[in-house]
Amino acid sequence: MSKYAGIVLAGGMSSRFGEPKALASWQGSTFIEHILKVMTSTLQEVVVISHSDIKERVEKLVQVPVIEDIPHYKGNGPLAGIVSGMEYIEADWYAIMPCDAPNVSHEWFTILLGQTSNEYDAVVPIINGRKQPLLAAYHNRVKEKIYALLQEEKRSMVQLLSQCNVKYIAGEDVQANADWFINVNTKEEYVQAQKDLSNK
């Protein structure tokens, strides 16, 4: 069993973006390829949770397993994706990553996993005053909490955090760059992110 594993959530339908965000172009590749390059440099095992509509296209781009949600919970948002990844890879801790934060750095995963300890169920960053539960780490004991929520048809990350002993870390306290956490939801944000990248 790995001590740490990674789960990339690439199953959303990207309605506001207009096309699958995982496949958006970024620095000569795609969001999903860039994110996986970063994650696999730090983590031994990584799995991508994808949607049936794009699963084959994602599989052609990446060198890690690509799976869909557990059938019974398909379409139940990030909680379904996280628990599906936890079932696929056995690990003590899981670093979670959405497919729409292409600025993420391998340094972030080093910082994040360095903050884990057995007394906590989760480690969640607070960036510019906002909790980032999808750029966080979760202990494998959280799996049962997720199943319990899904059985009650509860799908909120906030509901999950309310049931966990969470270590919140302020980004500035751990030298985390706020740019790592910028997520792209619309084409306007995508254009801005590309401009910001070219200005660096």
UniProtKB/Swiss-Prot annotation:
One of its GO terms (cellular component) is cytoplasm. GTP binds at L9, A10, G11, K21, D69, D100. Signal peptide: none annotated. Mg(2+) binds at D100. This is Probable molybdenum cofactor guanylyltransferase. Its EC number is 2.7.7.77. The N-terminal domain determines nucleotide recognition and specific binding, while the C-terminal domain determines the specific binding to the target protein. It comes from Bacillus cereus (strain AH820). GO terms for molecular function: GTP binding; metal ion binding; molybdenum cofactor guanylyltransferase activity. The lineage of its organism: Bacteria, Bacillati, Bacillota, Bacilli, Bacillales.
